[in-house]
């Protein structure tokens, strides 16, 4: 397999006053430096992990949930799938000195940004996947901002674990086109997949309701966020470009 797709678009973030890295879809980044990791999400999901003891943080950006990853494919292709993207992020955090049992997660994205998307909601699938995956890995979700209809801009401070999220206008250049392509890909995969056999006389218990998630403070609020929580921030319009 080829080299892992580590984000390389480094810049200086004037709003947060520190160096930053912009993550594109299928990329990830881990660091112990005082940096801001930035990405823009539609139906995609970004998982942000932090080890508060080691001061190490990381972010990924995946496009589809757990199915379809080919072990022989290039890493940049496999990173589009959540199962592989989460495995890579966790392993790279451990290599950097983090401990799995100390990891805390903040998760973002999973929006339904295409009007009329009802039968194939990639955002819902991605959101459900990342919650289930982290529960199985026993990594606690300390904050989340998932689903809805708006794209998001997410900033994550790797060294401290602080995060900020901004809801964007519905039509963001590049995001809408990417979402339409993802919907077509998911539709092709769904129609090509063989129909499962019907299991007769198999009564299933109703699923338990999902646990309540921590509330987060959105942009525009002036009150200070609690330590370690998702902090509201007023990102300038210049940064939305």
UniProtKB/Swiss-Prot annotation:
EC number, as in UniProt: 3.5.1.44
GO BP field: chemotaxis
Entry GO MF terms: protein-glutamine glutaminase activity
Catalytic activity: L-glutaminyl-[protein] + H2O = L-glutamyl-[protein] + NH4(+)
InterPro entries in the cross-refs: CheD-like_sf, Chemorcpt_Glu_NH3ase_CheD, Cytotoxic_necrot_fac-like_cat
Protein's UniProt keywords contain Membrane: no
Keyword Protein biosynthesis listed: no
Keyword annotations of the record: Chemotaxis, Hydrolase
Role description: Probably deamidates glutamine residues to glutamate on methyl-accepting chemotaxis receptors (MCPs), playing an important role in chemotaxis.
PANTHER family: CHEMORECEPTOR GLUTAMINE DEAMIDASE CHED-RELATED (PTHR35147:SF2)
HAMAP family on file: CheD (MF_01440)
Family of this protein: Belongs to the CheD family.
Protein name according to UniProt: Probable chemoreceptor glutamine deamidase CheD
Organism (species): Burkholderia lata (strain ATCC 17760 / DSM 23089 / LMG 22485 / NCIMB 9086 / R18194 / 383)
